Amino acid sequence: MAAHSYHFVTRWRVRGTVEEVGQIIGDADSLAAWWPSVYLDVSELAPGDEHGVGKVIELHTKGWLPYTLRWRFRVSEVRPPGHIRLEAEGDFVGRGIWTLAQDGPWTDLTYDWQIHAEKPLLRRLSWLLKPIFAANHHWAMARGEESLDLELARRRAATPAERDVIAPPPGPSTMPAGPLLGLAAGIALIVLAIRRRGASR
């Protein structure tokens, strides 16, 4: 696998039906509302058919690290209520597959995300900082599970008073760039020192 290639399999478990959860996951236009820690801006470029196949969404996203990503996806396959496949391009190039399965009162979600990072920062530094970039993805997905659980609770609330007591979803990270740059410089120095020691033997 190339240094800038990534393959993540994320599993969530939330209380609700596949139909409830699938309605939220399949509504890309609402991502910035219920998952604002990651989705800063979402724009629909093409509507797709009655199931959403062919829909094209443009995204501006981030994780806890101090950089943002601009990319888009096209929904290439939908099998209601529990399967959505999308194709990504831009700062990410690859594909993602959502699979939902009912388990009693719970829905188990699996997101299989296989991409190449094409943003210059990620492409050039993945050989060095891949574990940190991977941790950034895991942080984003953990916020997603938390935010989905809150969104399900909001949608079930019977009155405005019930809705008001539900916590808002977590917002974007405000981590400054300094720590990341310092960490990258430190790792680079360690790698260079190891290489020089190996070359001198």
Residue ranges and their predicted role:
Residues M1-E50, L192-R201:
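Hydrophobic ligand-binding cavity/cleft-lining segments
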Residues A2-H4, V14, D103-R201:
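Terminal "cap-and-tail" regions of soluble proteins that handle hydrophobic small molecules
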Residues S5, G26-A28, W64, D91, ...:
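Intrinsically disordered, low-complexity regions enriched in Ser/Pro/Gly/Gln/His and often acidic
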Residues R13, S76-E77, A101:
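Well-ordered beta-strand positions
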Residues E19, S43-R95, P105-D108, R143-A158, ...:
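Glycine-rich portal/gate segments that line the openings of hydrophobic small-molecule binding cavities
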Residues L31, I84, E118:
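Flexible, glycine-rich phosphate/dinucleotide-binding loops
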Residues W34-W35, W98, W113:
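Signature tryptophan residues that serve as conserved aromatic anchors
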Residues L69, R95-T99, K119-L125:
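A short, polar/proline- and glycine-enriched secondary-structure boundary/capping micro-motif
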